[in-house]
Amino acid sequence: MTHTIKILPEYFNPTAAGKKAFEIRRNDRNYQVGDTLQMKEWNGENYTGREIQCYVTYFINESKFGIAEGFCVLGTRTIDIIIPKKKRK
């Protein structure tokens, strides 16, 4: 299953750079290992056009390791990064 979700710039950048390979999310979508995340960068007002697509490789829910109720940690592996070219004026 593919889940389209928002991602803020402060999390998009380290994910795109390969420094962040996890997501902490509200577990309201029945995430499963093998799912695809389509993460669209959201700057608080608009989508920027930048996207990251990744596989869910690992899943931990709130019953483990002190994770808050209703949340989960998703291990991720990047498939693709989409950064639109800037338009020339």
Residue ranges and their predicted role:
Residues 1-89:
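Catalytic phosphate/metal-binding cores of nucleic-acid and nucleotide-processing enzymes, i.e., regions
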